[in-house]
Amino acid sequence: MIKILGIESSCDDTAVSIITENREILSNIIISQNTEHAVFGGVVPEIAARSHLSHLDKALKNVLKESNTKLTDISTIAATSGPGLIGGVIVGSMFARSLSSALKKPFIAINHLEGHALTARLTDNIPYPYLLLLASGGHCQFVAVLGLGKYKILGSTIDDAVGEAFDKVAKMLNLAFPGGPEIEKRAKLGDPHKYKFPKPIINSGNCNMSFSGLKTAVRTLIMTLKEINDTVINDIAASFQFTIGEILSSKVQDAIRAYEQITNNFDKKNIVIAGGVAANKYLQKILSSCAKTYGYRLIYPPIHLCTDNAAMIAYAGLERYNNKLFTPLNFCPKARWSLEDISN
């Protein structure tokens, strides 16, 4: 049986997973660093890298035990090798390459964004091509996923990522870290029409997005309010989340038009939303309705595979393993690595 070991360390989650050739997840361990970074209100790269160094060995032992797998049973080792916080990326990549060398097993360098992009093929086995909205704390872009290693970026944020906007607004409201889930929780209790926020470049006619102005508008509002109580916090969270939904819905329409100009597979109308923001139930509902209007089906991974995880890295490794796309051990990890720059 083919077993793929996946390692993820691009930000603040240390993750190790083992999957089979049949897309079965035997084990998927994630060691969160939220407690270590919460006091700073955000991820500290140096702390993250050191934590990966101390957690990876433990995570590997746990995943082997949970999956009843021996290291010698592993067929290949896939590890995030960019983009991301370079300290953590180097730690995970070096760990994987050391295992590869010691076990004499192939190594596969995985682009972290490709891991997110292919998650829906792991969970739903959808065919190529499909339209992807990659929405996380570090990235926000629409991508035409045409095949393995074949990606066309249709548009992206020109400033902040949508996940970063969630986290920063949560910090303004003194909510816990990470902020995205806290905003969603508070938004359920608030009035989404209480405050009207701007929707930057919503009528630009292209797939690019902007969230910096929205973030600034929230900060300006908070500074003008005399009192910030729970009701106000709930209303701001709801109004902010509503505005994000309006922006993304509008841009999905632009992305569909751009996507249909470059693909003729009109019988396979799938839109995938991946990345941490894909876990937001409100956005799932809004974007699902928008997709349905245009005859598309919105697909999003289960919540534990929306955020950073190693199962998606292992699956990307499986697709590359099946195509014999291995990586030399002297591969240099990258802090920046566009999906369009991936080579097969």
Swiss-Prot record:
Binding site for Fe cation: 112, 116, 308
Cofactor requirements of the protein: Fe(2+)
Matching InterPro entries: ATPase_NBD, Gcp-like_dom, KAE1/TsaD, Peptidase_M22_CS, TsaD
Keywords for this protein: Acyltransferase, Cytoplasm, Iron, Metal-binding, Transferase, tRNA processing
Cofactor note: Binds 1 Fe(2+) ion per subunit.
EC number: 2.3.1.234
Residues annotated for substrate binding in this entry: 134-138, 167, 180, 280
Catalyzed reactions per annotation: L-threonylcarbamoyladenylate + adenosine(37) in tRNA = N(6)-L-threonylcarbamoyladenosine(37) in tRNA + AMP + H(+)
Compartments reported by the entry: Cytoplasm
Primary location recorded for the protein, binned into one broad class: cytoplasm
One annotated Gene Ontology cellular component of this protein: cytoplasm
Biological role: Required for the formation of a threonylcarbamoyl group on adenosine at position 37 (t(6)A37) in tRNAs that read codons beginning with adenine. Is involved in the transfer of the threonylcarbamoyl moiety of threonylcarbamoyl-AMP (TC-AMP) to the N6 group of A37, together with TsaE and TsaB. TsaD likely plays a direct catalytic role in this reaction.
Protein family membership: Belongs to the KAE1 / TsaD family.
Listed name of the protein: tRNA N6-adenosine threonylcarbamoyltransferase
Lineage: Bacteria, Pseudomonadati, Pseudomonadota, Alphaproteobacteria, Rickettsiales
